[in-house]
Design a protein with these regions (language model features):
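Short, hydrophobic/amphipathic alpha-helical patches that form generic packing surfaces
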Residues: 26-30, 74-82, 111-118, 143-147
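Hydrophobic transmembrane alpha-helix bundles
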Residues: 17-46, 55-65, 127-135, 143-151, ...
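Exposed alpha-helical structural elements
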Residues: 5, 9, 20, 24, ...
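Long, His/Glu/Asp-enriched segments that create or flank divalent metal/ion-associated functional microenvironments
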Residues: 28-107, 137
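Extended alpha-helical scaffolding segments
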Residues: 94-100, 105-187
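Amphipathic alpha-helical substructures
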Residues: 1-37, 92-108, 115, 122, ...
Length: 187
């Protein structure tokens, strides 16, 4: 199937000429970016998470966040909406309330550990070490090492962990992380 064949099929079997124009098939199929006639999507679940983020950013305690039934996607939305810089006490409150440093969900833990690295939240570093030495997926480990490599303290930590974890990683991950850390095997 090609784009041309798909458009021809749509014109022949699915849509009237008026619908083809209204839908703007040409733009959807052949133009870059999002078409002008896209229908905005509203997620009630994410709106509820956004409300919790707003309350937390205003100083509300983590215990006030109603997250018991959140899915992984809601957690990722929440963590992604947090500010870049967060005070250690606020991080500790989130971590204590939701055990984010040891969540057991790789997606959530990865997002949390990136926040912990960015804010030098040391209570999460044992969990970071465990994550990097037990989780080999490049999509998780490479960004964490890259985040660590942005600071002197992080680079030292990354090298220490990587020296131990490197033999367990897939060769593609090793190639990526070697470049990120400037690994030469002697460190």
């Amino acid at each position: 199937m090609t784009s041309d064949r798909m458009v021809a099929y749509m014109k022949q079997k699915l849509f009237t000429p008026e619908e083809v124009q209204k839908i703007n098939v040409q733009e959807w199929v052949y133009q870059p970016g999002v078409p002008a006639n896209i229908v905005p999507v509203h997620s009630a679940a994410f709106a509820a998470v956004d409300s919790q983020v707003t309350t937390w950013k205003a100083g509300g305690p983590a215990s006030g966040i109603h997250a018991a039934k959140w899915s992984t996607h809601e957690w990722l939305h929440f963590l992604g909406a947090l500010p870049d810089t967060i005070a250690e006490a606020r991080l500790a409150d989130l971590d204590k309330t939701f055990r984010l440093s040891s969540s057991g969900n790789s997606e959530i833990e990865f997002a949390w550990l990136r926040i912990a690295i960015r804010n030098h939240y040391t209570p999460a570093f044992a969990g970071l070490d465990h994550f990097l030495t037990s989780q080999g997926r490049r999509k998780f480990v490479a960004p964490l090492y890259a985040d660590l490599a942005k600071t002197d303290w992080g680079k030292r930590m990354a090298m220490d962990i990587y020296k131990r974890a490197r033999p367990t990683y897939h060769s593609v991950a090793v190639g990526t992380i070697d470049k990120s850390l400037g690994w030469n095997g002697a460190k």
